[in-house]
């Protein structure tokens, strides 16, 4: 179990906030839940990974400020005739991340003096950095497929391709963290 300190959030509010986000992200979420998710491209490749929550018709997405700025820009492209607002806020939130039975779990945590940042969490749990994502990773090439994708949720961007790679078999390559705190994609 590790504590992550997140300092920023993309706040999505308005009547269409939940349906807008739900139609784009790979994981389903219910009221008052906290989960991991991907935003996939139309080609099924991972564009972003993040933690998100849904409460009182408000969706909050947590990641680094750099990733949130890029994510907001991408969401703005899809926000046509959608009644919601997108704002990046300063938001100090602590999350407890744990690996339970090969499933990556997340929940809020009390304020902690010992915590890790997003980069350290990416290395520890072999989650893709933005540089690795730009190389074109498929969801099944990352260790935590079942924690980030709900294959029974229905439509989301990249869903058809993600389902194909999930049911097609073993990936050709996989993301690995290396002891010198870097990542690389290794052929299997």
Model-predicted segments: where are they?
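Basic, glycine/lysine-rich polyanion-binding surfaces/domains
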Residues: 1-188
């Amino acid at each position: 179990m590790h504590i992550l300190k997140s300092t920023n959030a993309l706040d999505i509010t308005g009547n269409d906030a939940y349906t807008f986000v739900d139609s784009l992200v790979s994981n389903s979420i219910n009221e008052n839940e906290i989960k991991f998710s991907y935003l996939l491209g139309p080609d099924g490749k991972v564009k972003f990974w993040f933690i998100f929550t849904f409460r009182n018709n408000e969706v909050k997405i947590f990641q680094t400020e750099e990733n949130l700025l890029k994510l907001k820009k991408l969401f703005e492209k899809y926000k046509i005739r959608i009644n919601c607002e997108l704002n990046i806020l300063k938001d100090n939130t602590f999350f407890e991340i744990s690996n339970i039975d090969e499933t990556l779990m997340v929940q809020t945590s009390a304020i902690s003096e010992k915590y890790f940042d997003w980069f350290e969490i990416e290395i520890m749990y072999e989650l893709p950095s933005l540089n690795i994502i730009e190389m074109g990773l498929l969801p099944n090439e990352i260790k935590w497929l079942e924690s980030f994708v709900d294959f029974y949720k229905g439509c989301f961007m990249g869903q058809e391709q993600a389902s194909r790679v999930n049911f097609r078999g073993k990936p050709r390559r996989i993301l690995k963290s290396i002891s010198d705190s870097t990542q690389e994609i290794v052929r299997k």
